[in-house]
């Protein structure tokens, strides 16, 4: 297949949300004196992360609104300790999100891959991340010059994996489905979403997870593997 257009996910495909997000949470833990609730950061992290993953899955499927996600993910870990004020969680979320914009660690091989791809393809970001932080993260981490446009779910009015998100990106990038491939780490949002939109997929799967229900067009365990495909 000859591709001309690359739709690329941002978080945990290019921008290292696991490392950067963990750093921000550890700063929050110390600055907000969370040792009063959890003796160690690891204990707090192990409570926060499962809830955060669950809420993001609900957000992707349109089951909750952004406002519910950003409040509940910070309120849930401290609710057992009598903290129930949504405005407190909102302030904490705003602080956390601002901190993420200053983190610049990328997935290993990101810039080398983008340097290789830039002369050959038109590249676009497709992300469910929040508008107020994604543009800053992209710019501060040096990714902006590589991409023709950045497509966010908030601008499209729907999230990956919904087909409307992919249709929005195709239309606004003047791209054809059969000349486009989606690159991402999320099975549900990126890979299943692209397949359901009749777009080929490259699954970035560093954890060697099993596919669910179908075989993606391509699978790689590191970003360097994409150079063998494109």
What are these regions (language model features)?
Residues 2-108:
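N-terminal helical cap/lid subdomain that shapes the substrate entry/recognition surface
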Residues 51, 119-120:
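Structured helix-beta-strand junction loops
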Residues 62-63, 102, 123, 154, ...:
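A generic structural signal for short
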